[in-house]
Amino acid sequence: MGAAARSLPLAFCLLLLGTLLPRADACSCSPVHPQQAFCNADIVIRAKAVNKKEVDSGNDIYGNPIKRIQYEIKQIKMFKGPDQDIEFIYTAPAAAVCGVSLDIGGKKEYLIAGKAEGNGNMHITLCDFIVPWDTLSATQKKSLNHRYQMGCECKITRCPMIPCYISSPDECLWMDWVTEKNINGHQAKFFACIKRSDGSCAWYRGAAPPKQEFLDIEDP
């Protein structure tokens, strides 16, 4: 067998390996409950993107310019963040490096959670909670005003498979993936993990504020 023929199996194996291994530059995020996303974010707003452009954001260690996408936004409401309105949001230029793509033109409203930058602007990635406003449930919209904040001292633990358990009283077990094979299930859409008067945490469902009896250890 010639050298060229012997090299074919090796080339095929290398090609197959390249297709099976995850790309190093892919964006990978762990699922989080909307309440966790709210609590982890510096800024949470309802807004529209009206324009976008590519901008330079300094240089890397080799002197090459760092490109980012700048979205000019119209803020509708701030649920968490600084006193002044957010005017610009920045993100990476491609989804492979966790860049976010927003519809521009000011017609589509979003809930946008992200990190604050020192200049009063905001930075977002695909790992942040960014969804069209009209896809949120009524409970999620109401929870943004106060409910989620009530549970920021609680820990929401995602259950990837049965069995799964909580390890402390301040945890709520997030079961959507097990029960519905969907991280945007009933617990994500209709429940918040609320801290009660004894320091424990429990799931609470409903658009109305939690009753005092619930906070004083009523079974949810």
From Swiss-Prot:
Site (Involved in metalloproteinase-binding): 64, 96, 158, 177
Any Pfam family the entry gives: TIMP
GO biological process assignments: negative regulation of membrane protein ectodomain proteolysis; response to cytokine; response to hormone
Residue ranges, annotated region (Involved in metalloproteinase-binding): 27-30
Signal peptide: 1-26
MF GO annotations: metal ion binding; metalloendopeptidase inhibitor activity
InterPro entries: Netrin_domain, TIMP, TIMP-like_OB-fold, TIMP_C, TIMP_CS
Binding site for Zn(2+): 27
Domain NTR: 27-152
Post-translational modification: The activity of TIMP2 is dependent on the presence of disulfide bonds.
Keyword list, A-Z: Disulfide bond, Metal-binding, Metalloenzyme inhibitor, Metalloprotease inhibitor, Protease inhibitor, Secreted, Signal, Zinc
Biological role: Complexes with metalloproteinases (such as collagenases) and irreversibly inactivates them by binding to their catalytic zinc cofactor.
Quaternary structure (record): Interacts (via the C-terminal) with MMP2 (via the C-terminal PEX domain); the interaction inhibits the MMP2 activity.
Family the entry assigns: Belongs to the protease inhibitor I35 (TIMP) family.
Annotated protein name in UniProt: Metalloproteinase inhibitor 2
